[in-house]
Amino acid sequence: SRDFVLPFSALHRDMLALVGGKAANLGELTNAMLPVPPGFCVTTTAYTLIATDAELQSILNIYATSQAWEGGDVQRLTDMAQAVRHRILAATIPTEIADVITGAYGVLGSGEPIPVAVRSSATAEDLPFASFAGQQDTFLNIVGIEAVLDAVRRCWASLWTDRAVSYRESLGLDQSSIKLAV
């Protein structure tokens, strides 16, 4: 079975590609027995499943082949980012992912809906030459599984804000290779 969700206690700094910088650091702090609220990470494996959606891939392929991001065509980049965001926001989270998120959220509150923070953890976030501070979204005081699932979807979509796409473009990063954990 694929690891769509991992508890903080299972995370460490060697897992950047799977959980991103923020979650990897939360895992390190948890394992050092420092006071960290209990939590879990929705891994990049889950994002990748969403991102392999045929329509989403079609959008990315059209823009990649048009070389919009090599040419610095701001309008084409903006159009691409908006199309990807809308597709992610309209997507239904596959049952196999929603079920494990639901289970992990249920464990946090012992079956009761509790407020949680839903935060993005990008795989490119902690590159030594780039500060991605504030590029992806965070949602605080989220209560109930439907709200949690919606916040996860909105975090995934925030990978494709105009600002985030332009920033990656300015660093020469491959737009299609960026992944997001939550």
Task: Locate predicted features.
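N-terminal beta-alpha lobe that positions the nucleotide/phosphoryl donor
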Residues: 1-181
